[in-house]
Amino acid sequence: MFTTRTGTQRVDLIRSSLQENGVHSSAHLIGRISRGEMVRVRRGVYLPTQAWAEAPPWARYRIAICAAAMTQDLIFCRDSALVLHGIPLLSTPPAIFARTANPGEAKTHAPPQMTGRVPLQQFLRRYSESHPEAAPLRTAHLSNFPTKRLEPARPKNISRPEHRAQLRSGTFSIPEVRLTSGALEAVAGPAQGYRAEPLGLAALDAASRMSFTEAVVVLDAVKARDDAAPVPWLPYLGTKRQQAHWRRAWGFADAGAESALESESRVVLAQISCPAPTLQKVVRTSIGDFRMDFCWERERVAGEVDGRAKYFEPQYTNGADPAEVHYREKRRREALEAEGWQLVRWGKAELRNRQELVKRLGRAGLRPIST
């Protein structure tokens, strides 16, 4: 039901409205909620239950951003702005982040109950009855994202009261850019598009509050872009801790990383004292040239971080089935070994079980010294 990294069709959210016959569609949509067929993402914005249930968490987050934009004129910031700018995140954020010039609105706003007035267990039962072929719907599937409204970011040399006065007088306006309605791959956006903070400000404001690994995932991607320009926003880093955290993460970031898993791998490799690898090196073999995620030329070791997508998602497999992909990978490994390279593979499990990663690298001749 949605355009994702798997190439399936985008979600189209349904907005309740007054019909040509003078009847408002909300009554019909609420009736579909009562039968377990629809969920309410935001007030007046609906989606077929099965589409929401089958969407992965990252896609649900994007659907919620779109629904929020359809119902309120929001300027998205921090993690939400990064998503709109196409920057990967290590994990799905817990809330939608948006600015407000009204201090009274600067708080977390609970989302609507996705099942409307229908009790949750009753909704689950009705969905199961109307979708016997679908995977079971669970309570966790019906968790929605709140909207966290934040006062505008400000330079550290301007106090909050001064900044509020500037907003009231019109001498300062919230920084923003306009993004197209197609900014989110998971969902067809509102016709007017989205309002979001500039990428440089969003990256700086979000990354300075993230863990080091989360920040590197963001900043690797930001460094690969030519439209980020975070330097003009450096005065917006409010505390010395944020400034130090930003400098460390920005200094470590590398535009050569091409996925969140590669960025996370770079952090873990550094933490286990592995020699710094070369990123995206092209290795020539008898059957062709291969670009490797990580290379250690002196040790003749190549590293590849594999997610499930590499074997199952069409944009990576070019339509081949998993067995064919595995066969290609076998030939690739053999060709690399014939040129004197050892290939080490790892995925999410090994990044979270560092002892296993250390063993794999050690067997290939690398000597990380800590776990």
What are these regions (language model features)?
Residues 1-242, 369-371:
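Short gly/ser-rich loop at a beta-strand->alpha-helix junction or flexible surface loop bordering the NTP-binding
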Residues 2, 6, 23-24, 223-371:
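Surface segments flanking catalytic/ligand-binding clefts of nucleic-acid enzymes
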